[in-house]
């Protein structure tokens, strides 16, 4: 009798599911997993094609003509980085490249000229994706101490000092996540990069995420909710990554006030 009741109950559960034979928990887990994978793929490959946004093409065209007339050094003597990457503003190979918080790369002088030339009331919008640029990250080394490089550093610090502390929405923080995490971990494992207190905080965050994954105590236990119970693990790790990106942005802001 008990066996018959159990079979009837399982049939009722199958009838209540959206797809017959597949539980709703599995469907939710599959949908969320595909959404996370799609978001990750978009974040990784959205910067492959660096085409100027149609709304910025006229401004970039005028700026490009001005830069060509003011260019003192020939293209052959420009210091080049990322030989397979071209600056979409000047159409030359990246010279003293600077990366925006949205992950697009430009010549340092080009993005600064784009800021100075345009009539911006606040932070500029990215010439490619139109996302608000609140942070400029240098990709070139600190070896060159020429006057032009020192002036470029000063302009970049000036821009970051003005706009890096602007409030960010949760969606904007998610869009900035790949770029900020890449720079944060690169500095973490480089000599003279991040100070030790910040490195310790990153390590503690990663250890906390690891122990939460292996801990049997969960907000949504796998024993009760099955595969759906793994979603809270991904959510906690995702929040920790956002927290690391926020800390890294604060570190950059603190450097500017020294």
UniProtKB/Swiss-Prot annotation:
Tissues/organs with expression: Expressed in the spinal cord.
A Pfam family it matches: zf-RING_UBOX
Ranges of the Cytoplasmic topological domain: 46-201, 245-258
Assigned keywords, A-Z: Disease variant, Endoplasmic reticulum, Hereditary spastic paraplegia, Host-virus interaction, Membrane, Metal-binding, Neurodegeneration, Transferase, Transmembrane, Transmembrane helix, Ubl conjugation pathway, Zinc, Zinc-finger
Pathway: Protein modification; protein ubiquitination
Lumenal side: 1-24, 223
Main location: endoplasmic reticulum
Residue ranges of the TM segments: 25-45, 202-222, 224-244
GO molecular function, one term: zinc ion binding
Effect of residue 104 to A: Complete loss of E3 ligase activity
This enzyme's EC code(s): 2.3.2.27
Topology relative to the membrane: Multi-pass membrane protein
First-level EC class: transferase
Positions annotated as zinc finger (RING-type): 87-130
Cellular component aspect of the GO annotation: endoplasmic reticulum membrane
Reactions performed catalytically: S-ubiquitinyl-[E2 ubiquitin-conjugating enzyme]-L-cysteine + [acceptor protein]-L-lysine = [E2 ubiquitin-conjugating enzyme]-L-cysteine + N(6)-ubiquitinyl-[acceptor protein]-L-lysine
Keyword set includes Nucleotide-binding: no
One BP annotation, GO: gene expression
Disease: Ataxia, sensory, 1, autosomal dominant: A rare disease characterized by progressive ataxia caused by degeneration of the posterior columns of the spinal cord. Affected individuals have a reduced ability to feel pain, temperature and vibration, particularly in the hands and feet. Their most prominent feature is an ataxic gait resulting from a severe loss of proprioception. Thus, patients rely on visual cues for maintaining proper body posture, such that they are unable to remain upright if their eyes are closed (Romberg sign).
The protein's assembly and partners: (Microbial infection) Interacts with human cytomegalovirus protein NEC2/UL50; this interaction promotes of UBA7 ubiquitination and subsequent proteasomal degradation. Constitutively associated with the ERLIN1/ERLIN 2 complex. Interacts with activated ITPR1.
Annotated function: E3 ubiquitin-protein ligase that plays an essential role in stimulus-induced inositol 1,4,5-trisphosphate receptor type 1 (ITPR1) ubiquitination and degradation via the endoplasmic reticulum-associated degradation (ERAD) pathway. Also involved in ITPR1 turnover in resting cells. Selectively inhibits the TLR3-triggered innate immune response by promoting the 'Lys-48'-linked polyubiquitination and degradation of TLR3.
Name of the protein in its database record: E3 ubiquitin-protein ligase RNF170
């Amino acid at each position: 009798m008990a066996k018959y009741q159990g079979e009837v109950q399982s049939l009722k559960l199958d009838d209540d599911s959206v797809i017959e034979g597949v539980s709703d928990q599995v469907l939710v887990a599959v949908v969320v997993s595909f959404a996370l994978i799609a978001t990750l793929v978009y974040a990784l490959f959205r910067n492959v094609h660096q085409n100027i946004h149609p709304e910025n093409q006229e401004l970039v065209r005028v700026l490009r003509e001005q830069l060509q007339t003011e260019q003192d050094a020939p293209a052959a003597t420009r210091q080049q980085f990322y030989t397979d990457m071209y600056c979409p503003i000047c159409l030359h190979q990246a010279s003293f490249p600077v990366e925006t918080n949205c992950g697009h790369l430009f010549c340092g002088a080009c993005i600064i000229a784009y800021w100075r030339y345009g009539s911006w009331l606040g932070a500029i919008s990215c010439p490619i994706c139109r996302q608000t640029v609140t942070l400029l990250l240098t990709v070139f080394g600190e070896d060159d101490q020429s006057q032009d490089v020192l002036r470029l550093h000063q302009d970049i610090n000036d821009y970051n000092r003005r706009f890096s502390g602007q409030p960010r929405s949760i969606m904007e923080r998610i869009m900035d996540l790949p770029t900020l995490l890449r720079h944060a971990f690169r500095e973490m494992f480089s000599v003279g990069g991040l100070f030790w207190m910040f490195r310790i905080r990153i390590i503690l965050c990663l250890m906390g995420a690891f122990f939460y994954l292996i801990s049997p105590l969960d907000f949504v236990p796998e024993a009760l909710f099955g595969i759906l119970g793994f979603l809270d693990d991904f959510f906690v790790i995702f929040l920790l990554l956002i927290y690391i990106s926020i800390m890294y942005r604060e570190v950059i802001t603190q450097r500017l006030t020294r």
